């Protein structure tokens, strides 16, 4: 089979890399992405490995790159993508990259520091000028000359009125949210021996750190006494106020203001030069950072891979072990040969035997990746196990569409996915960072098929936004029924519900060419008809899907050489499943084919027949579908029950018998091996895990000696119980196809009846259809997308996911493997 139907053959290779060419060879392998290295130094600490110094140097460079990246983002610039694919640089270039990076980082730190210092000085000058410009007039309190006011202190200052009557001033600026608290604290701490004036700046000033505009409150405080002045200075320091000297004379203030404006202009010129130099430094950073990040990341990845290698006894080469696809072995040999020849040495790679299970490698493209992701989300398949993904490409969208069948809804989903497919090569679409969008974009081909299959099942259900469409003429004739029955006006007035009898000549003209006849949308028993149809269809699809899963297990047994499981597991499982539930499908189809409208009144009940089948009984009122039906049903039940002990005991007894036979044969085999020379032995398998003995599920000597019959029997008992009970529960689980399909149809009907039908009625009555239908259609469109497409679509998706993971894959798929994760630079280049 191809690699999509089964994972590729993977071999364990041993690489001998000369020390001089080890870096070049591993770098080349990273560009190709062919091998997954095994850690041969698992017991060695990360700090004791050979290339730990180089890894630390790369990590220090990454920290510097992070600092430069933050500075670029702080400046509002965008890093350009690196041009082309950059190889991992030679080790000697690491020192050059480090020197250039450190020099740029230091220049940025110096320029940023100077810029912040200049901005802080400019901010101080602007605040000082704003304080002088605010026009605070020195208010000499009349507390000592005039009458008392409400702020006149009740007690005199310590020392009496003759202590110090000179008035001093403190001017400054404070943040607005601190001004009320500052004013209250000053008044209480100084006991009222001050006069404070607060005013808000008319224009905000740029904050020196954040660069955002900030408002400030200027203040002027008049006080008496040195002790009060000390208190005021301490309080303003606690509130981080900007305090400036205040000049009482108007001429002196104007002169100081002119001097401050001149200093501000000079500082702005210096700051402009600093910012221009900063732009030049950032331009050099934009040139160095994108390629430098890619190169250092690749270099670090190479050294981490080299740390997984062991050193030869002569210390002249590194020894590595890696998993590689057999298909890629020639490319691996060529890459090692070309890389090592550049250094004048030769690297060697050869396959070695291994008892460990190899990793799973399944190559995908942009179409199959989303379907393979659905399978891998449940569990990565074992090595060379049958891959469910090729079949999931068809079955998953189809089962989704069975629950989501509607032509209109499927068409909207198809167009949305088609738009993503057509725009998949646009850089803006790929670079979108929205996580929800990325989820939809990665599954665009899955959505495309889901929409396409929903259109198909929508035509079968004959539903388009819950409305039936008449593509072909109906197979029922109302006129023929009216002519034959003689319906009069009085009869029609008395009977609101009329019955079309298919036994009347000319009433039923034949089946509808495709899908359900649109006349069923007018019938009172429309829901009952759809219930019966979808329920039986769900059971049929479920049994076929599960039987297909059991059949796929045959390919696993044949490939791994476990042919005894064909008779002891697969055959009993198919007999049990088809003997019971396959027979139920047969009854449904047989009744469809053999029970016509003329015999509909006496049609037997399949449900009663199926129940009587297990009870070994018969209902006289429920006639048989075919002769000797009871004998056939009893035989099938007995045959299905007989498969249970075979399924339970067959495989354990076979393994135990084979185990004992090998134990008896082992001494003779060892004597023959001792007599035979080493060169006389047959060729061993290169990959020990994939040898014939391993494929047959055989065990090595240690495992054979430890084989416990109770564990084997317990494992098989769990498998038997799970399968037998699962046949019942899984068949019932497929009824969710019927339930969700019915729910989707009814929800669509309710949305149409409660929104669009009301809107159409209002438009006809009021005569303003164009005005009324615009908001109503907008509401209908929004609710259709939000409820029927997103919510109902997600629900159907999750149920289809469960049907594949539990009901289908557990019949043949273990999912206990692990992916081949090749050493590659692809993510770094992207």
From Swiss-Prot:
Keywords associated with the record = Disease variant, Hydrogen ion transport, Ion transport, Membrane, Osteopetrosis, Transmembrane, Transmembrane helix, Transport
Q: Tell me the segments the record calls region Disordered.
A: 139-158, 681-701
GO CC: one term? late endosome
Q: What is its main location?
A: membrane
Q: Which residues lie on this side of the membrane: Vacuolar?
A: 405-406, 469-532, 592-635, 746-766
GO MF term set: ATPase binding; proton-transporting ATPase activity, rotational mechanism
The biological processes this protein is annotated with in GO are:
apoptotic process; autophagosome assembly; B cell differentiation; bone resorption; cellular defense response; cellular response to cytokine stimulus; dentin mineralization; enamel mineralization
Described function: Subunit of the V0 complex of vacuolar(H+)-ATPase (V-ATPase), a multisubunit enzyme composed of a peripheral complex (V1) that hydrolyzes ATP and a membrane integral complex (V0) that translocates protons. V-ATPase is responsible for acidifying and maintaining the pH of intracellular compartments and in some cell types, is targeted to the plasma membrane, where it is responsible for acidifying the extracellular environment. Seems to be directly involved in T-cell activation.
**Involvement in disease:** Osteopetrosis, autosomal recessive 1: A rare genetic disease characterized by abnormally dense bone, due to defective resorption of immature bone. Osteopetrosis occurs in two forms: a severe autosomal recessive form occurring in utero, infancy, or childhood, and a benign autosomal dominant form occurring in adolescence or adulthood. Recessive osteopetrosis commonly manifests in early infancy with macrocephaly, feeding difficulties, evolving blindness and deafness, bone marrow failure, severe anemia, and hepatosplenomegaly.
Q: How does it assemble?
A: V-ATPase is a heteromultimeric enzyme made up of two complexes: the ATP-hydrolytic V1 complex and the proton translocation V0 complex. The V1 complex consists of three catalytic AB heterodimers that form a heterohexamer, three peripheral stalks each consisting of EG heterodimers, one central rotor including subunits D and F, and the regulatory subunits C and H. The proton translocation complex V0 consists of the proton transport subunit a, a ring of proteolipid subunits c9c'', rotary subunit d, subunits e and f, and the accessory subunits ATP6AP1/Ac45 and ATP6AP2/PRR.
Q: What is this protein called?
A: V-type proton ATPase 116 kDa subunit a 3
Origin organism of this chain?
A: Homo sapiens
Which lineage do the record's taxonomy fields give for this organism?
Eukaryota, Metazoa, Chordata, Craniata, Vertebrata
Give the gene symbol: TCIRG1
